[in-house]
């Protein structure tokens, strides 16, 4: 009998833990949750206190049987899943499904996979925390209710196959609202005035000192007036202020700050960060990666202090304790940090090394001294103007934590850090000569679109979601195609520059590319329509405060302050009638439909909406005698901004370009974009070609290329058996026959195969598949023997087929 069985949720974690425990311990993995709510059913008994109906998925049944057998043979079962709510729920499900006995079961938790942490956990077991289990169960059931009840409403009112989620819908709303802010944004111009002054340096050489007018000028006239004044002006230093500044390091990483910084510094997606962090944790290299705590243990603080002192000296050491700001921080009780602070580098994949380096530096920096900076501000008066120029300089007196780490910022976060530069020696009352003064037209910028990192930060600010939900939320909204992560090309813009050199002012216009964006989250038309529909009919679900308050209630359940069923009852009592009323309500038009105007040719209504395969333009209505005409909206267009003229252009397709081989060549638009069609052959139009301007010659070239590709695909046909064909596929040549595919062995030349040889291959492979389906789960020795015979027979038949083909 096995003395001890330890069950964790991942095989990698099991492998690491097994190293630390002796021969009396066996470590197995549950591979995550072993049961869940039924996939295709509601699985919640609302009338019986929201009792959930769980099932063991088919792919987990064999594993559960194995775990049961192992648990029955063990004296003690140690449930060692993660220490957050999901981990506690996994432990509870294992306890229930494996029918474990309380006297033989121990629950252990640890936030790092080190020998010391594991042994300490075994010395200090606890019971399963049912409050944490209830909090996880409440979230799971509430999200199932929202998803199962809202989805049919969307199918009926918007478009089939749509789905909605509680946190995901709020994330989409943030992205939709930001997009509308951008479209509504009115750019304002102003003039930024900069001057280059010539100043003697310590060694007597003349150096340049850049200065900027204290505030921007609104118009070109104001800018020109100032430059005119500067022609005859004298410039004097009216004030010099020098003040010491201290820069303090950021706190160690939480889940969200790690996701944000990894995106900025390493270019990782949120999901990628979590995947790599999971591997580091399971390898025993970092602490648990789902946490909203910034706290470090005394052990970690002392280890950091020792590492800093050894590497940089005692002056760089400054012990700090950071307070966790997140209310109800409930995941793990320590920040993300290396398990061994003395290990500045690790082995592993490039991604693992990069992320570990980021975590190590951030943790070390958090326990280092402030950076000491001296900032100097120089005010330069203009003799005949009230305006002043300002020059700033910064000298780092002691680099402190900056020696190791500098925090990055999103493009929508303004930082107060000036460009660090050293000013020459200056004194109050000193006269200055300028080399040139420039007034450059600048424009206000619209709010930037969200990146994955900035969306996580916004969700955290609003109190929506928790460390375990950020990555799945962002992945889900992209998988459902409510949001896409894409690029926006910049636009050319003209700006004006006035330049004073000596006594002459030049006036020139320049061009620049502005507004280019990469890896930004943008709503799709479907995402916008679903968002607007949910806001109209289910305002609570989309309300930021409501969603945040639900998260707080989950925290209260976890702390044992609230009953999970009471919270669900309150929610369902209001939510369910809204669903019923919305399903029953009759609306004048389909959700998301936008009427653009009237078609001048037919006099019928022109509108855009979300169709079965995406956004479409429509001429006419269902009430008209003639059926409405539809045209697919181009990918670069939006039903929010498309004009009547642009919509009417879409109906110019299909258009006939001319003839090729006696048949019409037609350009049209379909579900997957524009295409060329001729005599049953279809060729996709490349993105570089416009369907409205493509020529007959260009179309014929595309058709010829498609014909060549098709010819290479079709290797051989047989007149006497038209249903059988030899084709060239992605994984090599194969036989297609009566709706099924049959692989051709590698040692056979497909072109040499006769019809008889093909049919023999089909028969042998069909017989083999039939034999497979008849086999039981337990493979006996006789079955294995018969398999060998079949494989030999197949080889013999294919050899025979080849020789038959060659004889012909």
Which residues make up each language-model segment?
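A conserved hydrophobic secondary-structure block that centers on an alpha-helix together
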Residues: 259-261, 265-272
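Basic, low-complexity terminal or inter-domain segments flanking catalytic cores
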Residues: 2-5, 16, 25, 151, ...
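Metal- or metallocofactor-binding catalytic centers and their adjacent structured scaffolds
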Residues: 218-253, 427-432, 438-440, 545, ...
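Short, polar/flexible loop-turn hinges at active-site or ligand-entry regions and domain interfaces
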Residues: 53, 81-83, 100-106, 125-133, ...
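Short acidic, hydrophobic short linear motifs in intrinsically disordered regions
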Residues: 237-241, 248-262, 287-291, 446-458, ...
């Amino acid at each position: 009998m096995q003395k001890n069985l330890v069950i964790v949720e991942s095989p990698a974690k099991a492998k690491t833990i097994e190293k630390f425990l002796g021969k009396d311990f066996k470590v197995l993995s549950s591979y995550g949750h072993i049961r869940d709510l039924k996939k295709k059913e509601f699985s919640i008994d609302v009338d019986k206190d929201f009792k959930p109906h769980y099932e063991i998925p088919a792919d987990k049944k064999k594993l559960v049987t194995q775990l049961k057998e192992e648990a029955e043979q063990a004296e003690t079962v140690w449930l060692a899943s993660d220490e957050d709510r999901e981990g506690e729920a996994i432990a509870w499900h294992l306890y229930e499904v494996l029918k474990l006995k309380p006297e033989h079961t121990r629950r252990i938790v640890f936030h790092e996979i080190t020998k010391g942490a594991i042994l300490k956990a075994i010395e200090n077991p606890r019971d399963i925390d049912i409050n944490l289990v209830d909090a996880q169960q409440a979230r799971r059931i509430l999200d199932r209710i929202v998803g199962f009840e809202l989805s049919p409403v969307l199918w009926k009112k918007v478009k089939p196959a749509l789905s909605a989620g509680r946190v995901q819908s709020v994330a989409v709303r943030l992205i939709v609202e930001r997009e509308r802010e951008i479209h509504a944004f009115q750019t304002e111009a102003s003039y930024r005035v900069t001057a280059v002054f010539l100043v003697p340096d310590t060694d007597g050489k003349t150096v340049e000192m850049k200065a900027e007018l204290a505030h921007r000028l609104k118009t070109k006239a104001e800018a020109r007036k100032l430059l005119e004044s500067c022609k005859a002006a004298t410039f004097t230093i009216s004030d010099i202020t020098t003040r010491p500044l201290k820069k303090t390091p950021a706190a160690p990483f939480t889940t969200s700050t790690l996701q944000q910084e990894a995106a900025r510094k390493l270019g990782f997606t949120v999901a990628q960060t979590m995947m790599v962090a999971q591997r580091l944790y399971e390898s025993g290299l970092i602490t648990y990666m789902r946490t909203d705590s910034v706290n470090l243990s005394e052990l970690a603080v002392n280890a950091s202090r020792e590492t800093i002192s050894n590497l940089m000296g005692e002056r760089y050491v400054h012990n700090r304790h950071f307070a966790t700001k997140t209310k109800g921080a409930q995941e793990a009780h320590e920040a993300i940090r290396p398990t061994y602070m003395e290990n500045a580098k690790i082995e592993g994949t490039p991604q693992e090394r990069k992320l570990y380096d980021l975590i190590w530096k951030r943790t070390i920096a958090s326990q280092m001294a402030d950076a000491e900076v001296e900032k100097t501000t120089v005010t330069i008066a203009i003799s005949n103007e009230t305006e002043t120029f300002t020059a700033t300089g910064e000298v780092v007196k002691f680099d402190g934590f900056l020696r190791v780490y500098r925090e990055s910022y999103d493009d929508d976060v303004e930082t107060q850090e000036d460009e660090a530069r050293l000013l020459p020696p200056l004194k109050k009352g000193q006269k200055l000569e300028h080399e040139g003064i420039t007034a450059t037209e600048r424009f206000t910028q619209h709010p930037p679109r969200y990146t994955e990192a900035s969306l996580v930060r916004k969700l955290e600010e609003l109190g929506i979601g928790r460390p375990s939900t950020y990555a799945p939320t962002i992945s889900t909204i992209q998988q459902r195609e409510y949001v896409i992560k894409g690029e926006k090309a910049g636009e050319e813009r003209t700006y004006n520059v006035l330049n004073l050199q000596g006594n002459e002012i030049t006036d020139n216009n320049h061009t620049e590319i502005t507004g280019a964006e990469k890896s930004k989250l943008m709503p799709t038309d479907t995402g916008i329509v679903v968002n607007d529909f949910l806001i109209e009919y289910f305002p609570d679900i989309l309300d930021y405060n409501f969603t945040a308050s639900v998260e707080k209630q989950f925290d209260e359940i976890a702390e044992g302050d609230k009953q999970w069923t009471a919270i669900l009852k309150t929610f369902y009592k209001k939510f369910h009638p809204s669903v019923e009323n919305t399903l029953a309500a009759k609306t004048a038009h389909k959700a998301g439909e936008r009427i653009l105007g009237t078609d001048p040719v037919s006099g019928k209504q022109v509108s855009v909406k979300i169709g079965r395969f995406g956004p479409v333009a429509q001429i006419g209505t269902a009430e008209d005698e003639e059926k409405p005409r539809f045209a697919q909206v181009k990918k670069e267009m939006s039903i929010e901004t498309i004009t009547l003229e642009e919509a009417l252009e879409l109906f110019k397709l299909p258009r006939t370009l001319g003839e090729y081989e006696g048949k019409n060549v037609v350009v049209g638009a379909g579900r997957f974009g524009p295409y060329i069609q001729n005599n049953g052959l279809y060729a996709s139009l490349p993105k570089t070609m416009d369907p409205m301007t493509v020529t007959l010659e260009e179309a014929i070239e595309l058709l010829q290329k498609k014909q060549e590709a098709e010819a290479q695909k079709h290797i051989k046909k047989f007149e006497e058996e038209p249903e059988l064909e030899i084709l060239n596929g992605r994984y090599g040549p194969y036989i297609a026959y009566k709706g099924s595919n049959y692989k051709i062995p590698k040692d056979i030349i497909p072109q040499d195969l006769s019809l008889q040889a093909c049919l023999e291959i089909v028969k042998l492979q069909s017989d083999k598949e039939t034999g497979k389906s008849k086999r039981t789960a337990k493979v006996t020795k006789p079955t294995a023997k018969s398999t060998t015979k079949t494989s030999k027979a197949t080889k013999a038949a294919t050899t025979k087929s080849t020789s038959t083909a060659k004889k012909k």
